[in-house]
Structure formats: C-alpha cells, structure tokens
Amino acid sequence: MKHKKFDIVALFLLIGVFMAALDNGIISAALTTINQSFEISAQMGSWGITIYTLGMAVTTPIAGKLADMYGRKKIFIIEVILFGFGSLLVALSPNYTFFIIARLIQSFGGGGLFVIASSHIISTYTKEKQGSMLGGLGAMNGIASVLGPNIGSLLINVSGTWHWLFLINVPVAIMIVNFMMIKMPETQEKVKTKIDKYAIIVFSFSTLLMMFAINNIQTGNIANSILSFSVIGLFVLAMIGYGILILVEYKNEATDIDAFLPFYLLKKPAFSVVLIMGVLSGMLIGSIIFIPSFVENVLHVKAANSGYWMTPLALASGVGASMGGKIVDKKGTIFALVIASIISMIGYGGLAFLTYSTMPFLVFSIIAGLGFGFTIGAPMTVLATKSAHSAKNNSTVIGTLSVSRQVGITIAPTMFTTFIQFGYSQMGSKIKESLNSAHFGLKDIPVSLMNIMEHRSGNLTKILGQVNQISNDTLRRAITNGIEDATHLAYMPIFLTAVIASFIILLLVTLFRKEFK
C-alpha cells in the first residue's frame, strides 16, 4: 500500500539527508580556522572538502546496492552510525592526517543517505505524490549545502572553536538511529548480488588523478604547466581510467556482478544525458561553497559574518526545490528543468557580472537559489527513473545519478580554487594598470605593502589593512581599484562556469526532450 501523505519516517529521512549534506557547507565557513589550527596551507586544507565529496561519490552506489541486497532500513541505520562516529573522530582529530581519515569515514556514512531516502520515497509513495516528496528531499539537500556556512559561522562565533561543527552531529545521529530502529519498515523484496569492487577502485583512482591534474595547474605559468606530465599526463591517465571503467562494466554485463555504473543504463542515450546533467548540477553545488569567501573578499564582509550571507540563497533554494517538485507533478520534468535552467542562468550571470555591492548580491543570490533549488530537486531524479525504463531497481538508477552529481561536486572545488589562484596572481599587473591610469608607479607603493604582496605573506584582509593606512587618497584608491579588479577576476569564472553549466542543461533538455518522454 503506497502512501499519499507525508509521514514521520519521511521526516527522519529528511533530517538524515540534511545532516549529511550540511557537512560540506558547514566546513566552508571554518576552512580558514581549521587550516590555522593544523598550520596547513589553504590548498592542503581544501582536501577536507575534496576527500569528503570523493568518499560520498564512491559510497553512494554501494549503499544503494547494499540497501537492495540487505534492506533499506538496515543499511540506512548503519550509514547514520558511520556518519556519527566519523563526526566524533573529526572533532577529536589531533592532527591533519587523522582529520582527513576521519572525514573519509564520515563520508562513507553520509554517501548512502540520499539514495536510500529517494528509493524509499519512490517505493512507498504514489506517483502523484513522488514529485513533491522528492522535491522536499532535494530541498533538504540544497538548503543544507547553502545553509551550512550560516550554521558554521554561528557555531564558531558561539563556541569559539571549529570542533562543535562536527560534535553536533553525534546526538542527531543517535536520535535518528533510535527512531528508525522502531518506526522504519524494512524492504520486503531483497536482491542478492556481488559488489563491483574493481570498478569502484578504478573510478576512485581515476577521479583522484583528475583532481590532482587540476590542482597542479600553476596559475603563474598556465600554458607550460598544462603541457607538463603533472597536468596533461595525469589527465590522460584519468581518461584512460574512465575508459577502463566502461570496459569493466561492459564485461560485467554478462556476469552476476551488480555493476557500479550499470552498462545497460549507460547504453540508453537518454539516461547518459541525465548523467551529464548530474555532473553539471554537481558543479552548481560546488560553486555555492565559495559564496562566503566571495562576500568576504569582494563585498568586504567580516569573515565571521560571511556565512550569514548564504541565508537568502538557502531560503530561495528551499522554495525552488519545493516549487520544482510541484511543477514536475503538474507540468512534467522537461518544463521544470527548462524553467530551472533559465532562472539559474539569470542568477549566476548577475553574480558574475553585476555584483559590486550587497544589494545586487542579495537580488541575484535569491534568483540563483531559486534556479539551484529547482535543478537539484525532483526533476532530475524523476527524469532519471523515467529515462532508465527497464532499470532493475530504483536504488541503482538514483545511485548512478548521485555518482555523476558527486563527480561534479568533487571536481568543481579543485577547478574553482585554480580560478581564484589565477585571479589573485594577476593582482600585481592589475595594480600596476590602475596606478598608471592615476599617474603613479610601483615605486609609490609603501615598502611594507610591497613585501606582503610579493611574498604572499598575508591574506586579502591584511593587504587591505595596509592599503587603508596610505595617506594619499588618490594613491589609496588606485591600489584598491587594482585589488578589486583582481578579486573580481578571481571569482567571476566560478559563477560564469555555473551559467555555462545551466545553459548546457537547458540545451540537453531541449535537444533530447523526445527521448525523455
């Protein structure tokens, strides 16, 4: 008997999904604090996010398959326990190596929550209600991603330490486990299969190579660094790895192994297109991580308050996800994704080109949030299950879509960090251009400020602090203009990439609309 109304089990599924998705957003507000705590560079610190998203990408399909084999209730509870235990280890980390290992354990727990919750909804709710319910699930996922920095900033301000960002997960996990053990029904039909361990290893290794390749691009010498083995060589090896992955899955089709990326799904053009859209939607999520640093460095908001500026986008994404689910129920997935893509392009386009003060930022972040929520909510999940047609089970389909999305989330921060580094590497030339237009030269810059900029011994706040001490108003304004030009150059490509991703989603939906019906 399928449900028509929202029930208490669905509520706790939403809480579990929210808890896991919150973690990547919550850490973005504390990255600087964590890096200082372990005395590591910002580039090294980004692995705290990267390893978590990679772990989730690998775990998502495995958890979905284990849920089909042993039951959704059992695997969901194990996932929550793993996540809570990992959170405790992260909070107690004595060094950065331990921190990274703990984050990986945490990701193994968080990776299966969304796919199991989605599968539960599709299996237990009527078709008329599935769009709204999946929209609510997408809303939790989206709101958590963008609300995380808010909560992170609040907890750091209240507690004075980053450890509580992770300790707070422990009692929530205990509550979910206790409730689900009593109330959540177990899957009635279970499928016994073998886990595709070789494909998982190849996928993980290839994705790591891709991330290292992007990370090795030298912002001061892009052309030569791209041609080096550490970039182009690793990229080629990653592509070979993905090719081997497809070959492995092709061979697995004739066996009883439950494929990591099922070849019978990859053979369906419509489903392959949905996977591409999944990667692109993951990149949209990845762009949100950099909003706090954007408002801090571009809009000059205090670091402690930067996470709060995610609130409008967070609320808008929740509204967008909910609306997206209802539109799917009434107008269909194609119409919903077309609207989502157009709204996203307008919002992210405004953030890229028109955001020079707080008011335009608020307006365009709300628009971007609406489109973002629409996109990651119900439309893609419903489209994936429809385009798969003969899929053996919903968990496999949703799990495969989640893998593609996690690939986008995993690679995007590494790519966007490279954009930021390139933008800031142009600071010297931008300042020089600004000084020349104001009839000044580099010789007019105070020695103390030149030392900070040349040796990168300070962050942007420290540099601006030195600039504000310059008594000559014209000189101070010229230097500030150069710094602001470099800062915009650092962040504009992030939002421009989101615009391009949204446009490609719109293009794919339009071109393949007949195949999706």
Q: What are these regions, as identified by a protein language model?
A:
Residues G64-I200:
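Helix-loop-helix hairpins in multi-pass membrane proteins, especially solute transporters
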Residues Q406-L508:
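Hydrophobic transmembrane architecture of multi-pass small-molecule transporters
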Residues I8-A63, G148, I288-P292:
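Extracytoplasmic
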